[in-house]
């Protein structure tokens, strides 16, 4: 029996990408023995009310953030499509591209696990991939309720404990807007890029 190779997928707005995203991706890569992790910035993300920075700038920040890690790469597949990005559509396209030799692992945060029932075609998503939900200490209860709900329907979600690093893209944007430093919350090259472009200052 051929052992399938495992590929990690991390989708999101990345507005901006920060150290928390990278730590989750690295924890997942190590825990699930992933060959690589592909970051997939969205063009427009469903259920997001905040207006994001231009897709090309968010894409560039992700490229800068992952370039030093040989296991990490970036795909512009959702940005090239333009329009709304649905995880189920992205997974179908990647399943077709990689074929049966690869197993897809979709990596998400605690909030994404909690909101999964509201996603477009959540059961199809769980059929197409292994869904990994990163959970910080103290944030596991709501995620476990969702996991139990899907398990009753024969769909499994893997919970991945990660260090309690309280960083969010929203907090970073607010700090910049208020003139506070975000150094060490984002990779150094991303920090420099944000400053040079004067992003999130208004």
Question: Language-model segments: what does each one mean?
Answer:
Residues 1-202:
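Nucleotidyltransferase catalytic core that binds NTPs
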């Amino acid at each position: 029996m051929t052992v399938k190779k495992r590929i990690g997928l991390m989708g999101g707005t990345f507005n901006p990408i920060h150290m928390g995203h990278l730590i989750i991706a690295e924890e997942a890569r190590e825990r699930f023995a992933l060959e690589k992790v592909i970051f997939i910035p969205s063009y427009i993300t469903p259920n997001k009310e905040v207006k994001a920075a231009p897709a090309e700038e968010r894409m560039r920040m992700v490229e800068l953030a992952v370039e030093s890690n040989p296991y990490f790469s970036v795909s512009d597949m959702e940005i090239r499509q333009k329009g709304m990005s649905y995880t189920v559509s992205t997974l179908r396209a990647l399943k077709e591209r990689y074929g049966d030799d690869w197993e897809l692992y979709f990596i998400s945060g605690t909030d994404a696990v909690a909101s999964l029932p509201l996603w477009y075609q959540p059961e199809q998503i769980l059929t197409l991939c292994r869904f990994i939900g990163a959970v910080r200490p103290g944030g596991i209860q709501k995620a476990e309720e969702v996991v139990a709900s899907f398990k009753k329907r024969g769909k499994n979600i893997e919970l991945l404990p990660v260090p309690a690093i309280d960083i969010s893209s929203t907090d970073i944007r607010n700090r910049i807007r208020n003139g506070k430093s975000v150094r060490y919350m984002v990779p150094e090259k991303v920090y420099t890029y944000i400053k040079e472009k004067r992003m999130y200052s208004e």
